[in-house]
From Swiss-Prot:
Residues 791-800 have a biased composition (Basic residues). It comes from Tobacco streak virus (strain WC). This is RNA-directed RNA polymerase 2a. It catalyses: RNA(n) + a ribonucleoside 5'-triphosphate = RNA(n+1) + diphosphate. GO terms for molecular function: nucleotide binding; RNA binding; RNA-directed RNA polymerase activity. Residues 459-574 form the RdRp catalytic domain. SUPFAM superfamilies: DNA/RNA polymerases (SSF56672). The lineage of its organism: Viruses, Riboviria, Orthornavirae, Kitrinoviricota, Alsuviricetes. Its EC number is 2.7.7.48.
Length: 800
């Protein structure tokens, strides 16, 4: 690039001189330009051919070539007077640079230039050369002739990023080179097999929390029925009245008027939205659960309009390059530890390690591989909509129909080759982050590993809610990610290929017959979605706030979610930049420790230490107890997922504190919730055993169409016998022998996981159902796990 610029300057200067001389006019600064370029050429030529060229010979060559009448001849060697030797070159006599040895050869047209060159270096008279030293030479600088020039070069301040070290210690472990699990692919894709330095946190971090819940007070009977409906009705008064089973039918059969940007529609595509309706289980409680959405052209078009089209244009005019440089500089200054960043080497060998991990975990078909990343069309995406909707946190379900989210994704062959690079980038980002920054992802970077002291001493919490985060991203966010990936050591050819393909991409939903294109916005669902959104979020926060301020104790970022904990309230004068500069519709909703739909609480462990506990948001959790999109085949997985999150509610203090936080989040202190805490206390009994979970969650009579007849005929009498038991006079069911036996058997089985009468007391890996299935008996009649029997599907419920 420097050579191109130099050639352009020479070209324009020559053109200017030619135009002037053609009219017989010499430019005013002609002599100055010649002096500068002549001196530059002499120095460059001498430095390039230092073995046989000196400044004297180069000057003779240049001056001789410039004279058309010059005839090359042997120049007599002149004796050098040491008095005139310059300070920096003992082999050149600057006082004898005239070329004209004969009187008939005139150099009158260059006398001024020669006079200038002859005095380019000067030692004052009366001073011997040997007495000159470094210090004495400086004393005579004022008497040395200055170089006349009209070019004034102003000293521009160069912003240097100082190095720092926050004291965070990360284990660097050397990993030897490993063999590829698919050598034919890794060789073709130019993935190198060599050793590398692993930057993961190893034995210094735990993969599971230490905290265990205390037993619920004896005043609460865990055998009482779980009924969260009063709490949901209290928080969302209109959710119970909404029956959305026929909402999609209205969308498909009624007239519709949509304003969308340019897209392609295949009108011959038709999807039956009634297919599979009779396979969905009917819940017992109406608490705002949403029905399954069938991918159709209209449903997909509604989702695309909201998630991808009609991009908001909120940015004002700004200098793109200046803002880009400031964003990257502030990110590296405020977010990254420069000492650890300087230790990062270019990626070499790490991509093969993560490539092998991807093959082991995902087991993609190797036939999907289409070639190296630079030869694959990364700008072609596939599209689909999510058939399961998120619970609604506002009481507007009766007036607004929720729109499903969209997923934009590459084929497996592309993901297979791009995921290893982004996994390397994520590990490197976690390595260089300062200690006050938390990115909850992976086994060794979870919320409970946060420093509880920072959370406990934080008095102010800044939660930032970005609306339309993915589709609002533009060129600025695109270029910021590009620069940050290069700073993390990702190969430049890969980064360039990836981001060039994201300047404009073509998306196609073949099942629904829709095609459209987008420019810089986030492709929700590709291999870089989470990491890219995290980088963008941290960049915005570092630009709007001074994250290096000691007032800020911690910063948590995960995708588009973020939380800042501080001692004093953060300044708000720059928060409008989120809209006017970064094009994000931004809300700052609550002064609460809340991130990723979880409340953060500081709890005390058994050994006296403290730990951060992430508690699910009850406003969403209670709505999941009345699902309308469950099928029999996923019922056991749904039960297992509830076991993994409801174990925290075995502690009465956690239930109380969570209820207070959720109450304030919903009503801002204007209303008290009477049933929320009791509903949270009763949640663990819901998953005490699978039998109780099925009985309290599923309406078997209404779900008869999707349950096998022989299983249903066994279930109904079994439930009827348990429901029609002897009750006391107050209407409270009396415990029977079957209840006690069933509870005892469930407790004995769960005691193996260190719990009694509860689903989980700590986070553990998913159960080994093969070992569990051998520890219980099987019932040939019902196939349902009761106090005596277990299912025939490796411990799962078999209703079909």
């Amino acid at each position: 690039m420097d050579l191109v610029i130099k050639n352009l300057i020479v070209y324009h200067l020559r053109r200017r001189i030619d135009i002037g001389t053609s009219f017989g006019i010499e430019p005013a600064d002609y002599i100055d330009w010649v002096k500068v370029f002549l001196l530059k050429f002499i120095i460059e030529h001498t430095a390039r051919f230092a073995d046989f060229a000196t400044i004297h010979t180069t000057m003779l060559l240049v001056l001789g070539e410039d004279d058309p009448n010059y005839v090359e001849k042997d120049t007599p060697i002149m004796e050098i007077d040491p008095f005139y030797l310059p300070y920096d070159d003992l082999d050149v006599d600057y006082t004898s640079l005239r070329v004209c040895g004969d009187e008939d050869q005139s150099c009158s047209d260059r006398d001024e230039l020669s006079d200038f060159i002859s005095n380019i270096s000067h030692i004052p008279e009366g001073t011997s050369w040997g007495s000159e030293s470094d210090t004495s030479f400086v004393e005579h600088l004022e008497t040395i002739q200055d170089i006349p020039t009209k070019c004034e070069i102003a000293d521009k301040p160069v912003e240097e990023i100082p190095f720092d070290d926050d004291g965070k210690v990360v284990n660097d472990v050397w990993v030897d080179a490993e063999l590829s699990n698919a050598p034919e692919i890794s060789c073709d894709a130019d993935i190198r097999a060599c050793g590398f330095v692993s930057l993961r946190l190893l034995e210094s971090s735990r993969g599971y929390p230490k905290w265990t819940p205390e037993r619920v007070s004896s005043g609460l009977n865990p055998d009482l029925p779980v009924n969260s409906k009063p709490a949901v009705d209290e928080i969302f008064p209109h959710h119970h009245s909404v029956d959305d089973r026929f909402f999609q039918e209205w969308v498909e059969t009624h007239d519709i008027d949509l304003e969308v940007t340019s897209c392609d529609l295949d009108m011959s595509t038709f999807n039956d939205w009634t297919k599979g309706v009779d396979t969905r289980l009917v819940p017992n409680m109406s608490v705002g659960g949403l029905s399954h959405r069938v991918p159709t052209q209209r449903e997909a078009l509604l989702a695309i309009k909201k998630r991808n089209m009609n991009v908001p244009e909120l940015q004002s005019n700004f200098d793109h390059d200046d803002v880009l440089n400031r964003c990257v500089t502030r990110f590296i200054t405020h977010v990254v530890d420069k000492t650890r960043l300087s230790k990062l080497n270019p990626i070499s060998g790490e991509e093969l390690h993560y490539f092998n991990q991807y093959l082991e975990n995902k087991n993609p078909p190797l036939s999907e591989y289409k070639g190296p990343v630079p030869l694959v069309a990364l700008d072609k995406y596939m599209h689909m909509i999510k058939t399961t909707l998120k619970p609604v946190e506002e009481d507007n379900l009766h007036i607004e129909r929720p729109i499903p989210a969209t997923i934009t994704y590459h084929k497996k062959g592309v993901v297979m080759m791009t995921s290893p690079y982004f996994l390397c980038a994520m590990v490197r980002l976690l390595y260089v982050l300062k200690s006050k920054f938390v990115v909850p992802t992976g086994k060794y970077h979870q919320i409970f590993q946060m420093n509880p002291e920072l959370l406990k001493h934080s008095k102010e919490f800044k939660e930032i809610d970005f609306s339309k985060f993915d589709k609002s991203q533009g060129r600025l966010h695109h270029d910021v990610q590009f620069r940050l990936f290069l700073a993390l050591g990702i190969p430049e050819h890969f980064v360039t290929t990836w981001f060039n393909s994201h300047e404009k991409s073509y998306i196609r939903d073949r099942d629904c017959g829709i095609g459209f294109s987008v420019d810089y916005q986030r492709r929700t669902g590709d291999a870089c979605t989470y990491l890219g959104n995290t980088l963008v979020t941290l960049s915005v926060l570092s630009y709007v706030y001074d994250l290096s301020n000691p007032n800020i104790l911690f910063v948590a970022a995960s995708g588009d979610d973020s939380l800042i904990g501080s001692i004093e309230p953060l300044p708000r004068e720059k928060e409008d930049l989120c809209v006017s500069l970064f094009n994000f519709e931004t809300k700052f909703p609550h002064n609460q420790p809340f991130i990723c739909s979880k409340f953060l609480l500081v709890v005390e462990c058994d050994d006296g230490s403290e730990e951060v506990l992430a508690v699910p948001n009850p406003l969403k959790l209670l709505q999941k107890l009345g699902p309308k999109n469950l099928q029999v085949t996923v019922l056991d997985d749904y039960y297992q997922s509830l076991c993994d999150i409801l174990w925290v509610f075995n502690d009465a203090d956690v239930c109380r504190r969570t209820a207070e936080l959720a109450e304030y989040r919903r009503f801002k202190g204007t209303k008290k919730c009477l049933f929320l805490e009791s509903a949270l206390l009763s949640l663990p009994s819901l998953v005490a055993n699978r039998m109780k979970f099925v009985r309290r969650t599923i309406n078997l009579e209404s779900s008869r169409a999707c349950i096998r007849n022989d299983v249903y005929s066994d279930l109904v009498p079994h439930f009827d016998s348990r429901v029609s038991r002897c009750d006391d006079s107050d209407g409270v069911r009396t415990s029977t022998f079957d209840d006690r036996k069933s509870s005892k058997h469930a407790s004995d089985k769960l005691r193996k996981t260190e719990c009694y009468g509860e689903a989980r007391c700590r986070i553990k890996p998913r159960r080994n159902r093969k070992s569990e299935s051998g520890a219980v008996q099987y019932s040939q009649s019902s196939g349902i796990e009761t106090g005596k029997a277990n299912s025939s599907r490796k411990g799962r419920i078999k209703l079909h």
